Amino acid sequence: MQVYRFREKRSGDRPCVVTIGNFDGMHLGHQALTGAVVNEAKDRDLSSALVTFHPHPQEILHPRRPVQRICTPQLQNRLFDDSGIDEVHVIPFTPELAELDADAFASRYLLQRFKLEKLIIGYDFRFGKNRTGDFILLERLGQENGFSLEEVAPFRIKSQIVSSSLIRQLIREMRFSEVEEYLGRPYSLLGTVQKGEQRG
């Protein structure tokens, strides 16, 4: 897996299947989304790419209410790698970026960056100033720029939609068995799995 800061030039010009979002925690819903991207790319002999943000947008938009990260950036990158994604592109989220309208955002961070064949997004993905960018806008951009668009349905466990905000709430309430069910892996406060003394 190749990791790029957005100021770094992407090596090569291989056509891509792309997804974009925060992916905090890489829970089962995120894994379903990245799995769809990886499978589509493999089926079409394309590169799979994931676009994400650092810091978390909420840290810039609402600095007095800092977001509780579910896992460390180091663990997040390891989970991206485990997912089979070929490329991760990290956008520095700044106050200036937060002011970009949706069309300008899509042009700068998707259309100019990638030879985009297909974009796969989560059901709740929004982008651009005031979150005005949505599926309808992306569908129009796809028709104008020759890429296809797919929206992945929410991932549910027992009718409950798995989301990062839900997992943060469960962590605050110390309901760790449910946290691990929604993450699909063990959870620790440090963001890494801690081994015991293994005395039997």
Spans of features found by a protein language model:
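Glycine-rich, highly charged phosphate/nucleotide-binding loops
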Residues: 68-76, 100-106
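ATP-dependent adenylation/nucleotidyltransferase module used to activate substrates
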Residues: 80-82
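Conserved phosphate-binding/catalytic loop of the ribokinase/pfkB sugar-kinase fold
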Residues: 90-110
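N-terminal catalytic cores of NTP/NDP-binding nucleotidyl/phosphoryl-transfer enzymes
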Residues: 9-72
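Short acidic-hydrophobic, aromatic-tinged amphipathic segments that line or gate anion-handling sites
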Residues: 2-8, 89
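A short acidic, often aromatic-flanked loop/helix-cap motif at beta-alpha or helix-coil junctions
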Residues: 9-13, 95-98, 156-160
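Active-site cores that bind ATP or allylic diphosphates and position pyrophosphate for catalysis
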Residues: 104-107, 111-200
